[in-house]
Amino acid sequence: MTTSSRILRTAAAAVLALCLPVGFAAAPAMAAKRAPVVYDALGDSYGSGYGVPPYLDACGRSTAAYAVQIDGRMRIELDDFAACAGATTAGLLATQLTALDATTSLVTLSIGGNDIRWGDVVGACVTQGDLACAGALQATTGVIRNVLPGRLHSTYAQVAAAAPNAHVVVTGYPRLFSPEYGSYLAASPAEQQAMNDGADLLNSVIADVAHQHGFQFVDVTRRFLDHGVNAPEPWLLGLSDPGRFHPNVDGYEAYAAAVTSSVNPRDLR
């Protein structure tokens, strides 16, 4: 276990002990006779918990991350918290695969958004004109369709090889906007919908490749409905926040709920 994992588990334990209901907190004790599920968390900023400081290190790892929140549930024991803000598929392969081995029972993986430079697209649409937004969306759509699948295939194959006994959960990305609440900065409702469509396309490609490798895909789209950056109760941070267009505390709680409700304990060895 890495030092960062130990520190995060200690910090998170105090918070979770106050928040979990008695019945839920007692569950691990009843399962004490079974071996713990060795869990390694890989990915980008959506996996590291970026957006909710304080951060443990330059990777933007936060105790708000869904990986830390699910630590201790369903016999899950967070072993290596390797997810790092800014990670691409190439970066993950270069720096995060060492977290995995034959003892790994569960892997969560959030990757792909930085490969298509999704943050740049959103930035263009909310701060520039219609032409800049349309051009950015068109360009990134081509990357999603024609470039990203190959990168994901390579990444997933190497994850599977590095953790041959693990159940791998791939998490998707939320729609960032709630167009029904009107314009957001320079982005009209129509442009917001176009970006949401782009997020849907990204998720569909990630899900398709994940399923081809026998991985489980967890879609968070429905959980974030009506909680876009321009909604009355946003679960995502807006442009003025340093963690712009990443989940807030509520958003990461939604991720944790999505993962724990989707994973069958029988799949965890």
Language-model regions, residue ranges each:
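Secretory targeting and sorting signals
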Residues: M1-A31
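Short amphipathic alpha-helices and their capping/turn segments at secondary-structure boundaries
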Residues: F24-V38, L92-L109, G113, R151-A166, ...
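Serine-esterase "nucleophile elbow" of acetyl-processing enzymes
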Residues: A32-A83, T98
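Structural recognition of the beta-strand scaffold that forms the well-ordered cores
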Residues: V38-G43, G47-G49, L78-A83, S105-S110, ...
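Solvent-exposed loop/turn segments at secondary-structure junctions
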Residues: S45-S48, E77, C84-A90, G113-W118, ...
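Acidic/histidine-rich helix-loop elements
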Residues: Y50-S62, V122-L131, R244
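Oxyanion-hole/transition-state-stabilizing segment in secreted/luminal serine hydrolases
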Residues: G91-I144
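Catalytic His-Asp segment of secreted/periplasmic serine-dependent ester chemistry enzymes
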Residues: P174-R269
